[in-house]
């Protein structure tokens, strides 16, 4: 069962989002003119949709510096609780069984863990770099002793958790294949319970557009949950998709144009999927 959960940012979070997005838009054009990589800009925009803590860590430890970062960092430090975290707590209070929470960023993962532990939940973290035996150990501890497993993207490979039937996407990757991989951790052979997928998305942000693209345009969740249909898109195309999304966000002059360009992108992706399915 798919649950798309809207989250309204707090006033400070919304201001932070607008500051970051404004910087990204301005810097995008400068880099395009100088043929400079925009990968960091994609990262900043994704981090602010994940959590203020992910952005704070990136800007504090990054090699780049711009004067506006001072204002962004000061505001990020004022934010102690994210609106998404409050929503997760609401969801968890109404769930039966164990839950896996996915996030793309380690700083967000640590924030979620500390918050939930203070609320009395038994939490375990899962990251990349573990051996197969290490992964099996974490899986065993989660199954036997913990309520919630919080995993980063890097940790999801080779993780089979069919004993768990609740999954919360704390943030939404811009790559549909990563969503598919997340869901595949629990929606697989051996799963005996109904699977609940909770997709958090922040209103009036790029995240809302991403969910609409994945859910409405390419029917990602219906495809994966229904028949475990694989997304047949190569890594280069997915890399270009992230650039396309940022370009749309920056170049659209108004909300109508933003909607129109995302609709066109969705139609294009659906066309690619249909073509590649016919080749198989």
Model-derived regions: residue spans:
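Conserved Helicase C-terminal RecA-like lobe
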Residues: 2-9, 43-147
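SF2 helicase motor core recognition
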Residues: 109-110, 149-165, 183-191
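Conserved nucleotide-binding/hydrolysis micro-motifs of P-loop NTPases
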Residues: 10-14, 48, 54-55, 62, ...
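A short beta-strand element within the Helicase C-terminal
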Residues: 159-172, 195-199
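Alpha-helical elements of the RecA-like P-loop NTPase motor core of helicases
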Residues: 15, 57, 110, 114, ...
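C-terminal accessory region of SF2 helicases/translocases
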Residues: 193-280
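Inter-lobe connector of SF1/SF2 helicase motors
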Residues: 1-74, 118, 240-280
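Conserved SF2 helicase motif VI
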Residues: 175-197, 214
């Amino acid at each position: 069962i798919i649950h798309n959960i809207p989250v309204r940012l707090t006033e400070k979070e919304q201001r932070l989002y607008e500051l970051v997005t404004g910087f990204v838009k301005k810097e995008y054009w400068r880099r395009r003119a100088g043929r400079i990589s925009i990968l960091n800009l994609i990262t900043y925009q994704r981090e602010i949709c994940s959590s203020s803590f992910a952005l704070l860590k990136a800007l504090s430890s990054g090699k780049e510096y711009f004067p506006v970062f001072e204002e962004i960092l000061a505001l990020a430090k004022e934010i102690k609780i994210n609106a998404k975290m409050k929503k997760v707590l609401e969801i968890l209070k109404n769930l039966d069984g164990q839950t896996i929470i996915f996030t793309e960023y380690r700083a967000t993962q640590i924030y979620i863990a500390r918050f939930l532990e203070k609320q009395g939940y038994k939490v375990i973290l899962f990251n990349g770099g573990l051996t197969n035996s290490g992964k099996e150990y974490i899986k065993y501890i989660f199954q036997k002793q913990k309520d919630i497993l919080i995993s980063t993207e890097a940790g999801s490979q080779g993780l089979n958790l069919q004993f768990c039937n609740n999954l919360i996407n704390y943030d939404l990757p811009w790559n549909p294949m990563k969503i598919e991989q997340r869901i595949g951790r629990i929606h697989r052979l051996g799963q005996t319970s109904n699977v609940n997928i909770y997709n958090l998305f922040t209103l009036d942000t790029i995240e809302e557009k991403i969910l609409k693209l994945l859910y409405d345009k390419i029917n990602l969740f219906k495809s994966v949950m229904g028949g475990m249909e694989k997304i047949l898109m190569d890594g280069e195309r997915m890399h270009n998709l992230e650039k396309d999304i940022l370009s749309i966000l920056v170049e659209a002059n108004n909300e109508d144009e933003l909607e129109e360009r995302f609709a066109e992108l969705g139609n294009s992706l659906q066309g690619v999927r249909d073509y590649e399915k016919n080749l198989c």
